[in-house]
Amino acid sequence: MSMTPKLALQRLIDHTDFTHEEMLDVMQQIMGGAFTTVQIAGFLAGLRVKGETVTEIAAAAQVMRALSSKVEVEDSSYLVDTCGTGGAPTKAFNVSTASAFVAAGAGARIAKHGGRAASSKSGSADVLEALGVNIGLTPEQVARCVNEAGIGFMFAPNHHAAMKYAAPVRRELGVRTMFNLLGPMTNPAGAKRQVMGVFDRDLVSLLAHTLKKLGSEHVMVVHSADGMDEISFSADTYVAELKHGEVNEYTLNPAQFDMPLHEIDSIHVENAQQSSEIILGVLSGARGPARDIVLLNAGAAIYVSGIAGDLQDGIAQAAHSLDSGAALHKLQQLKALSQAA
């Protein structure tokens, strides 16, 4: 029996979880325009109140993946994404975007997925534009960037046309919904390795197990005690790491890596331009808090890529990427390739 909007909403009122097949059915209908905007809003709000399960998120991600415009790169086996959920209350600069260039400079192949700011001061698309990168590329042009420069950016709206029915509802609702979780799980290039920052500690284990169900290979899902959706330089970071088919949960602290503690305020920005200036400074060799948090997060990306044996090794390789100028060169390459497209 097809999961009609009325039946789906009744299931949520009854606090009943959906099976994998039921969630596939509902998502296909939402993405196909069968639900009205009011029904989509009711479904998303009800699902949030009930609480999303691994099965439900995985099924929804499968539908979004199937409907997305793919980026066909030459070898996707060791591709890394640093896309997070967004939604953290901090005003930090775009750490994951800076980390992507540093990881690429160390030899990791980066296929970064992202969009514009929703609740933050600057989304990855916003800061990349401020850095001079053309984000309006076709899937084929993004693939060329990854193949030739080792890094490419996939602007989410260009790859998820089926979101046209749900996107306006998300904006109007103004609260976090399941779609905040799906962005990092629907990489159009099929990256199976990623560092995913999340806005809530309760999501760390949930999303790591969801990515396991979706076939990811090496993933670190992170959230810090100070509220950051990054590996923090000021507090403990909660981690769920998927590797070799197993999820292990643990805590990281900057002291483990001989990192000094910093105040979060030291990396706050008000807009994409300020964020781009900090990133350019870090890539150009500037020392200080911004560099330290980038080292931690780029080190994680290098580690999950498979070219570092552990996080400590990844951090060391990240430092070399910055100090050698390799990370800055990756930004220059991506700018040139994207602008020439």
Swiss-Prot record:
What pathway or pathways are given for this protein in its record?
A: Amino-acid biosynthesis; L-tryptophan biosynthesis; L-tryptophan from chorismate: step 2/5
Identify the cofactor(s). Mg(2+)
Cofactor details (free text): Binds 2 magnesium ions per monomer.
Q: Name one GO cellular component term.
A: cytosol
Q: Where does anthranilate 2 bind?
A: 170
Keywords assigned by UniProt?
A: Amino-acid biosynthesis, Aromatic amino acid biosynthesis, Glycosyltransferase, Magnesium, Metal-binding, Transferase, Tryptophan biosynthesis
**PANTHER family, A to Z:** ANTHRANILATE PHOSPHORIBOSYLTRANSFERASE
Q: Which residues bind anthranilate 1?
A: 84
Description of how the protein assembles with itself and partners: Homodimer.
Listed GO MF terms: anthranilate phosphoribosyltransferase activity; magnesium ion binding
Q: Report which reactions are catalysed by this protein.
A: N-(5-phospho-beta-D-ribosyl)anthranilate + diphosphate = 5-phospho-alpha-D-ribose 1-diphosphate + anthranilate
Q: What is this protein called?
A: Anthranilate phosphoribosyltransferase
| Known EC number | 2.4.2.18
**Keyword Transferase on entry:** yes
